[in-house]
């Protein structure tokens, strides 16, 4: 519990600090998140999730996964949430 409280306190402190004071930390967080998002393992996970969603939609509408991949995004999401 103390670690969570300390973490929240630090985050709130960083939010209320002037950008010049907290800029380096936020820049580091932003650059690290960007590097992680563009890393190979994350790309593989995103592709796996996309393929699983395509297969699920294809199964629901009775089409092939490639046909499900060609659907407009709105229709695709509507089918996922039905």
From Swiss-Prot:
<keyword id="KW-0044">Antibiotic</keyword>
<keyword id="KW-0812">Transmembrane</keyword>
<protein>
    <recommendedName>
        <fullName>Opistoporin-1</fullName>
    </recommendedName>
</protein>
<keyword id="KW-0472">Membrane</keyword>
<keyword id="KW-0964">Secreted</keyword>
<dbReference type="Pfam" id="PF08102">
    <property type="entry name" value="Antimicrobial_7"/>
</dbReference>
<dbReference type="GO" id="GO:0016020">
    <property type="term" value="C:membrane"/>
</dbReference>
<feature type="propeptide">
    <location>
        <begin position="67"/>
        <end position="82"/>
    </location>
</feature>
<keyword id="KW-0295">Fungicide</keyword>
<keyword id="KW-1052">Target cell membrane</keyword>
<keyword id="KW-1053">Target membrane</keyword>
<keyword id="KW-0813">Transport</keyword>
<keyword id="KW-0732">Signal</keyword>
<comment type="similarity">
    <text>Belongs to the non-disulfide-bridged peptide (NDBP) superfamily. Long chain multifunctional peptide (group 2) family.</text>
</comment>
<keyword id="KW-0406">Ion transport</keyword>
<feature type="signal peptide">
    <location>
        <begin position="1"/>
        <end position="22"/>
    </location>
</feature>
<comment type="function">
    <text>At high concentrations, acts as a pore former in cellular membranes and causes the leakage of the cells. At submicromolar concentrations, degranulates granulocytes and has a weak hemolytic activity against human erythrocytes. Also strongly inhibits the production of superoxide anions. Has a strong antibacterial activity against Gram-negative bacteria but is less active against Gram-positive bacteria. Also has antifungal activity.</text>
</comment>
<dbReference type="GO" id="GO:0005576">
    <property type="term" value="C:extracellular region"/>
</dbReference>
<keyword id="KW-0354">Hemolysis</keyword>
<dbReference type="GO" id="GO:0006811">
    <property type="term" value="P:monoatomic ion transport"/>
</dbReference>
<dbReference type="InterPro" id="IPR012526">
    <property type="entry name" value="Antimicrobial_7"/>
</dbReference>
<keyword id="KW-0929">Antimicrobial</keyword>
<keyword id="KW-0204">Cytolysis</keyword>
<dbReference type="GO" id="GO:0044179">
    <property type="term" value="P:hemolysis in another organism"/>
</dbReference>
<dbReference type="GO" id="GO:0044218">
    <property type="term" value="C:other organism cell membrane"/>
</dbReference>
<dbReference type="GO" id="GO:0050832">
    <property type="term" value="P:defense response to fungus"/>
</dbReference>
<dbReference type="GO" id="GO:0042742">
    <property type="term" value="P:defense response to bacterium"/>
</dbReference>
């Amino acid at each position: 519990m103390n670690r969570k409280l300390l973490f929240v306190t630090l985050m709130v402190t960083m939010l209320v600090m002037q950008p010049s004071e907290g800029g380096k930390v936020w820049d580091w967080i932003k650059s690290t998140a960007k590097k992680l998002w563009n890393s190979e393992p994350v790309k593989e996970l995103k592709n796996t999730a996309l393929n699983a969603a395509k297969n699920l939609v294809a199964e629901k509408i009775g089409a092939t996964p490639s046909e499900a991949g060609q659907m407009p995004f709105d229709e695709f999401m509507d089918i996922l949430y039905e």
